[in-house]
């Protein structure tokens, strides 16, 4: 991963670029007797990802903070299952080799009308392949109940949208090319606090 940061008094920008490699193995064997295992599944998955991301923050006084972020990923995935048995009872290799571009962009505005209260709104949109998600909004609120112990009340409501990954669609075994995106809403609320002694433990 390569990263770059640039800071000023009331704004900052940052960028990252990198490469991620993942390898998965899935084996399934059946005991056919006498301690002998017959492998029914012998699946291997190679996942290569190139990515770049950038983000920026801009403060207006002490009450407003605006942030923007964009992420671009290029995925290359290869999957093989060498234990598939065809109708003529011969083993054959089944799998897939696909690539997909994914883009995510978001903007956030945070307002602190008082020292204790913070309110923020986020708008996000994503692209996967040639498809675009609907606009995904989220709202967050937090209130500092007590400075002692940093006791905060937090709440949020957001729209959720999840599209299938390449492995969700094509992984052998278990991939399902008929999967469709999932959507919904989530609501959260709670209290957070911190214990410890500054400079000693937390």
PLM features per residue range, with description:
Residues 1, 41-49, 61, 96-102, ...:
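Transmembrane beta-barrel outer-membrane domains
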Residues 10-28, 144-146, 150-154, 181-202:
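Membrane-embedded beta-barrel scaffold of Gram-negative outer-membrane proteins
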Residues 1-19, 60-66:
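Transmembrane beta-barrel wall of Gram-negative outer-membrane proteins
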Residues 19-23, 28, 32-120:
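Outer-membrane beta-barrel transmembrane domain signature of Gram-negative proteins
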Residues 1, 13, 22-30, 74-83, ...:
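Outer-membrane beta-barrel proteins
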Residues 1-4, 98, 158-202:
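Outer-membrane beta-barrel signature, preferentially recognizing the C-terminal barrel domain
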Residues 2-6, 52-58, 105-111, 139-143, ...:
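Residues on the lipid-exposed face of transmembrane beta-strands in outer-membrane beta-barrel proteins
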Residues 8, 19-25, 72-78, 101-103, ...:
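Transmembrane beta-strands of outer-membrane beta-barrel pores
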């Amino acid at each position: 991963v390569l990263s770059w940061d640039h800071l000023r008094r009331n704004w900052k920008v940052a960028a990252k670029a990198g490469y991620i490699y993942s390898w998965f193995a899935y084996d399934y064997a059946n005991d056919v007797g006498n301690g002998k295992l017959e492998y029914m599944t012998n699946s291997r998955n190679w996942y290569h990802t190139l990515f770049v991301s950038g983000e920026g923050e801009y403060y207006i006084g002490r009450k407003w903070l605006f942030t923007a972020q964009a992420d671009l990923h290029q995925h290359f995935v290869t999957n093989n299952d060498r234990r598939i048995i065809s109708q003529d009872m011969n083993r054959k290799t089944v799998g897939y080799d696909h690539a997909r571009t994914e883009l995510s962009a978001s903007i956030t505005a945070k307002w602190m009308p008082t020292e204790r209260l913070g309110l923020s709104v986020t708008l996000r949109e994503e692209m996967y392949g040639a498809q675009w998600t609907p606009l995904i909004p989220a709202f967050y609120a937090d209130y500092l109940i007590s400075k002692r112990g940093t006791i905060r009340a937090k709440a949020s409501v957001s729209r959720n949208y999840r599209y299938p990954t390449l492995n969700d669609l094509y992984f052998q075994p278990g991939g399902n090319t008929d999967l469709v995106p999932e959507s919904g809403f989530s609501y959260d609320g709670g209290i957070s606090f911190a214990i410890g002694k500054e400079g000693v433990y937390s």
